């Protein structure tokens, strides 16, 4: 069962952990973007409803992480 995070800061801290493997970004037609980070035990998700915040969050991801964009 995935864990849903509410705060962007918590998501960024989770993405910077050692056991974080990859991030998937899923964009819906109605300007809802979901970020999913795969860690060793859980899949952590966050839902961003604003396009500007989603772009900012995408640029804030750690550079060593594998990022895959889904449509």
From Swiss-Prot:
The keyword Ribonucleoprotein applies. InterPro entries: Ribosomal_eL38 (IPR002675), Ribosomal_eL38_sf (IPR038464). GO terms for molecular function: structural constituent of ribosome. GO terms for cellular component: cytosolic large ribosomal subunit. Belongs to the eukaryotic ribosomal protein eL38 family. This is Large ribosomal subunit protein eL38. One of its GO terms (biological process) is protein-RNA complex assembly. Keywords: Ribonucleoprotein, Ribosomal protein. Pfam families: Ribosomal_L38e. PANTHER family: 60S RIBOSOMAL PROTEIN L38, LARGE RIBOSOMAL SUBUNIT PROTEIN EL38.
